Amino acid sequence: MALVRSLLGAKKILSRSTASAAPKGFLAVYVGESQKKRYLVPLSYLSQPSFQALLSKSEEEFGFDHPMGGLTIPCPEDTFINVTSRLQ
């Protein structure tokens, strides 16, 4: 019986971890040129000039009509990782 409760508890944790909503304090962004990948970034990045430059690029390309339904940053994934790794 304990094993069944343990398995049910694990299922609840997995379903919560795959939720589409970003956790408190984070923003979900989609990054990539052809294949988009979802990243969660801390809200504190929004005040950083280098991250704001990525947001400006997104605004220039998409305006406020993002094809993924969320914020899309049109740059190569490695560029995004390079920029955000400097912010940590």
From Swiss-Prot:
InterPro entries: SAUR_fam (IPR003676). It comes from the Eukaryota. Belongs to the ARG7 family. GO terms for cellular component: plasma membrane. GO terms for biological process: auxin-activated signaling pathway; response to auxin. Induction: Strongly induced by auxin. The keyword Cell membrane applies. It comes from Arabidopsis thaliana (Mouse-ear cress). It is found in: Cell membrane. This is Auxin-responsive protein SAUR21. The gene is SAUR21. Pfam families: Auxin_inducible. It is a peripheral membrane protein. Functions as a positive effector of cell expansion through modulation of auxin transport. Keywords: Auxin signaling pathway, Cell membrane, Developmental protein, Growth regulation, Membrane.
